[in-house]
């Protein structure tokens, strides 16, 4: 309502929600339902170029395209979803991987550090230069079908957070920001400034900027 009252000529109202679809966000709007969309970034948002744009049943013609062109003018890499889905693209992919990572550890197949080592030193670096569809297309789908038929039936299909998460939350071990500084890892004694530098380093290289000295 504040936007409606103070910005009568506004062309688009963008939410950065990672899960709410536009129709939920526009439900309380009285005037500009057709201009409300989601433009979801990934953190650190000032460095990561990707945005996922999503409209709803009320979204007006041309609104998504206007937002896409605006972001492209800022050297971002936006995509427009053909229809809403909880979690959009990025979080659906990320949490599908997270669900299986949790399953691997709970099943006794490996430890959390093993999962992270696999991600750091196997296929994740590849996907900064080519996409998943490109990768499997280039490898020949006739080979891919065997792996799909073998692995897919064994993957986790749980529909809620597992005990590995809920048990830790119950005892207060919610991660690096917890009073205990424990989650899956023990963060006591970890240099958090150095950790944050590791978080940001790939993006500095990706956009060809020099790492800051301070």
Summary of predicted features, one role per range:
Residues 1-12:
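Rossmann-like NAD(P)-binding element
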Residues 15, 54, 105-106, 169-170:
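Hydrophobic residues in alpha-helical segments
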Residues 21, 97, 143:
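Short phosphate-engaging motifs
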Residues 27, 96-103, 110-112:
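Oxidoreductase and adenylate-handling cofactor-binding alpha/beta cores
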Residues 49-50, 97-101, 146-151:
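A general alpha-helix detector
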Residues 65, 76-82, 107, 112-214:
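NAD(P)-dependent Rossmann-like dehydrogenase/reductase catalytic/cofactor-binding core
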Residues 70, 103-104:
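Residues within well-ordered alpha helices
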Residues 12-83, 87, 91:
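Rossmann-fold dinucleotide-binding core
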């Amino acid at each position: 309502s504040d936007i409606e009252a103070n910005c009568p000529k506004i062309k688009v109202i963008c939410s950065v929600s990672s899960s709410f679809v536009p129709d939920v966000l526009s439900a309380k709007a009285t005037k500009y339902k057709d201009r409300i969309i989601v433009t979801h970034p990934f953190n650190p948002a000032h460095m990561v170029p990707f945005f996922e744009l999503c409209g709803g049943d009320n979204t007006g013609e041309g609104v998504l395209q206007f937002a896409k062109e605006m972001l492209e003018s800022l050297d971002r890499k936006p995509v427009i979803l053909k229809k809403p889905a909880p979690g959009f693209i990025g979080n659906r992919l990320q949490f599908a991987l997270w669900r299986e990572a949790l399953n691997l550890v709970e099943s006794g197949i490996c430890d959390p550090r093993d999962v992270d080592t696999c991600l750091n030193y196997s296929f994740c670096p590849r996907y900064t230069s080519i996409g998943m569809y490109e990768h499997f297309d280039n490898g020949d789908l006739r080979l891919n079908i065997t792996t799909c038929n073998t692995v897919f039936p064994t993957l986790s299909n749980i529909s809620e957070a597992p005990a590995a998460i809920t048990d830790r939350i119950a005892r207060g071990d919610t991660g690096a920001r917890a009073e205990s500084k424990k989650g899956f890892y023990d963060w006591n004694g970890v240099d958090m400034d150095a950790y944050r530098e590791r978080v940001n380093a790939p993006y500095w290289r990706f956009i060809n900027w020099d790492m800051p000295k301070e």
